[in-house]
Every structure is written in structure tokens, then in C-alpha cells.
Amino acid sequence: MLKPLGDRVVIEVLEAEEKTASGIVLPDSAKEKPQSGKIVAVGSGRVLDNGTKEPLEVAEGDTVIFAKYSGTEVTYEGTDYLILRESDILAITK
């Protein structure tokens, strides 16, 4: 499994809708880039200016909304993930 460093998290991206509310099937070129996903791994935390380590506010299993073009897309063992900094996460959905 991937283990992110520092203040980074690994997210399994939730796919965008295939159809509109009225039932129209969207081609790949018309789909919005997904902005939500489930956290599958978190780093050890961010290092503060005084040298202490602060744990992250998010945890494995949280579903989050993140900035549209943030992070780095990676494929690991056949699954696509997004690795991004905690500061790119906008909200946790419950």
C-alpha cells in the first residue's frame, strides 16, 4: 500500500456522473474532473516552524472534497489514486 509522507494524503477518486439528471449520457470529453474521493492513507503530519509535528485533521476512510486541479495522479497495482497535500482538501463530507 502507498504510504504518503508528511502532510500528504492518498485519495481514491470517486468517478464523475455518467448521466445528467435528465438521463443524458455524457461523453468523457464533457465530464467534469472529479473533486471528491475517499482517503485511503495519510502521512505522519506537517512539521511546524518550531520543529514539532502536528497530526493531520483528516483520517483514513474520510470522504473529502478537494481543489479541482490539485495533486498528482498515480496508478498503483492497477488502481488510480491522487496524492495531494492536506491544504488542498476543502471539506470533509459526512
From Swiss-Prot:
| GO BP: any one term | chaperone cofactor-dependent protein refolding
Give coiled-coil spans as residue ranges: none
Cystine bridges: none
Family annotation (CDD domains): cpn10
Q: Which PROSITE patterns match?
A: CHAPERONINS_CPN10
What does the record give under GO molecular function?
Answer: ATP binding; metal ion binding; protein folding chaperone; protein-folding chaperone binding; unfolded protein binding
The primary site where this protein sits is cytoplasm
Question: Does Chaperone count among this protein's keywords?
Answer: yes
| Leader sequence residues | none
Pfam families named in the record? Cpn10
Tell where it localizes.
Cytoplasm
Q: Give the record's keywords alphabetically.
A: Chaperone, Cytoplasm
Output a single Gene Ontology CC term carried by this record. cytoplasm
Query: What exactly does this protein do?
Result: Together with the chaperonin GroEL, plays an essential role in assisting protein folding. The GroEL-GroES system forms a nano-cage that allows encapsulation of the non-native substrate proteins and provides a physical environment optimized to promote and accelerate protein folding. GroES binds to the apical surface of the GroEL ring, thereby capping the opening of the GroEL channel.
Which PANTHER family does the UniProt record give? 10 KDA HEAT SHOCK PROTEIN, CO-CHAPERONIN GROES
Q: Which family does it belong to?
A: Belongs to the GroES chaperonin family.
Subunit structure, per the record? Heptamer of 7 subunits arranged in a ring. Interacts with the chaperonin GroEL.
Indicate what this protein is called per its UniProt record: Co-chaperonin GroES
